[in-house]
Amino acid sequence: MAAEEEEMDSTDACERSGWLTGWLPTWCPTSTSHLKEAEEKILKCVPCIYKKGPVRISNGNKIWTLKLSHNISNKIPLVLLHGFGGGLGLWALNFGDLCTNRPVYAFDLLGFGRSSRPRFDTDAEEVENQFVESIEEWRCALGLDKVILLGHNLGGFLAAAYSLKYPSRVSHLILVEPWGFPERPDLADQERPIPVWIRALGAALTPFNPLAGLRIAGPFGLSLVQRLRPDFKRKYSSMFEDDTVTEYIYHCNVQTPSGETAFKNMTIPYGWAKRPMLHRIGKMNPDIPVSVIYGARSCIDGNSGTSIQSLRPHSYVKTIAILGAGHYVYADQPEDFNLKVKEICDTVD
């Protein structure tokens, strides 16, 4: 990966065809250049030296990658996988601390951010495999032997899936508020049944991608993000006083919905995974230590850590709660989060 930034092609397979992609630029005030500028505004505030550029994988695809290092080569690198709808820029509050004593890599998942946005399969298992293989090809391209793999949300699910398939490459698996672990509860067993109107709305929205509303909103999409998620501006207020982060999130999610469509094909109504990870994680190599980090104030079910422990009774599994943090643990309480992650990484070396 070159030290200087290299421009990525903006003509991936799914961008060359289809009425939607031809219509989007005229309706949504976005482009790959807008996304690049939004990312650059974020990275300018990162307090450490980094290299960025595309890593080429198969089928002409590229994985947009950031490497941070203080010329430390004898430590196992930490690799960060962002969640659904995110990008590598959202780790801005963490880069400075995490790279002090080991190399840190962050990249935009295939189909997200500034990485290529190809057409994914429609089968959930094959989609998962496409993501996993893109991570493995990325690792091979960079010549990394073993890594500490950390994933948030969707990134946590994919980190676990990768660890299942390529256990010899993972020194420690860190799951941060992971998506897709429990199976959907039986509606009849829920203490608070889902109201009929919500079920009807869910059925009506099933044909659409999760973030289609942003693209439909067109020129009003950015203000929609700012109104619906003002918390992101607060989370990053120590680094940015303006709408830098919400602009970045907007431009990440109004491009061609490649990864978004892939995610939709991995889900069943109300956002549950078609292939829950708890059904498989017991088969993971018992030598891989697993740490599960949750926000104590998160609305996401935090019982997956306990479930993983019961499914891997003879393996290292530790659950860590970050006080005062919600689902976006790394942004809600970055200092505590960074400290816990560094402590985990130190046990590996």
UniProtKB/Swiss-Prot annotation:
Motif HXXXXD motif, residue numbers: 327-332
Keywords attached to this entry: Acetylation, Acyltransferase, Cytoplasm, Differentiation, Fatty acid metabolism, Lipid biosynthesis, Lipid droplet, Lipid metabolism, Phospholipid biosynthesis, Phospholipid metabolism, Transferase
Keyword Thylakoid: no
Reaction(s) this enzyme catalyzes, per UniProt: a 1-acyl-sn-glycero-3-phosphate + an acyl-CoA = a 1,2-diacyl-sn-glycero-3-phosphate + CoA; 1-(9Z-octadecenoyl)-sn-glycero-3-phosphate + (9Z)-octadecenoyl-CoA = 1,2-di-(9Z-octadecenoyl)-sn-glycero-3-phosphate + CoA; 1-(9Z-octadecenoyl)-sn-glycero-3-phosphate + hexadecanoyl-CoA = 1-(9Z)-octadecenoyl-2-hexadecanoyl-sn-glycero-3-phosphate + CoA; 1-(9Z-octadecenoyl)-sn-glycero-3-phosphate + octadecanoyl-CoA = 1-(9Z-octadecenoyl)-2-octadecanoyl-sn-glycero-3-phosphate + CoA
Modified sites of kind N-acetylalanine: A2
UniProt entry tagged with the keyword Acyltransferase: yes
A single Gene Ontology CC term: cytosol
E.C. designation(s): 2.3.1.51
Record-annotated AB hydrolase-1 domain positions: 77-185
Annotated GO MF terms: 1-acylglycerol-3-phosphate O-acyltransferase activity; carboxylic ester hydrolase activity; lysophosphatidic acid acyltransferase activity
UniProt-listed GO biological process terms: cell differentiation; fatty acid metabolic process; lipid homeostasis; negative regulation of triglyceride storage; phosphatidic acid biosynthetic process; positive regulation of triglyceride catabolic process
Record entry for activity regulation: Acyltransferase activity is inhibited by detergents such as Triton X-100 and 3-[(3-cholamidopropyl)dimethylammonio]-1-propanesulfonate (CHAPS). Acyltransferase activity is inhibited by the presence of magnesium and calcium.
Localization (cell): Cytoplasm; Lipid droplet
Location, primary (coarse class): cytoplasm
Family: Belongs to the peptidase S33 family. ABHD4/ABHD5 subfamily.
Record text about domains: The HXXXXD motif is essential for acyltransferase activity and may constitute the binding site for the phosphate moiety of the glycerol-3-phosphate.
Job of this protein: Coenzyme A-dependent lysophosphatidic acid acyltransferase that catalyzes the transfer of an acyl group on a lysophosphatidic acid. Functions preferentially with 1-oleoyl-lysophosphatidic acid followed by 1-palmitoyl-lysophosphatidic acid, 1-stearoyl-lysophosphatidic acid and 1-arachidonoyl-lysophosphatidic acid as lipid acceptor. Functions preferentially with arachidonoyl-CoA followed by oleoyl-CoA as acyl group donors. Functions in phosphatidic acid biosynthesis. May regulate the cellular storage of triacylglycerol through activation of the phospholipase PNPLA2.
Subunit text: Interacts with ADRP, PLIN and PNPLA2. Interacts with PLIN5; promotes interaction with PNPLA2.
The protein's name in its UniProt record: 1-acylglycerol-3-phosphate O-acyltransferase ABHD5
Organism the protein comes from: Sus scrofa (Pig)
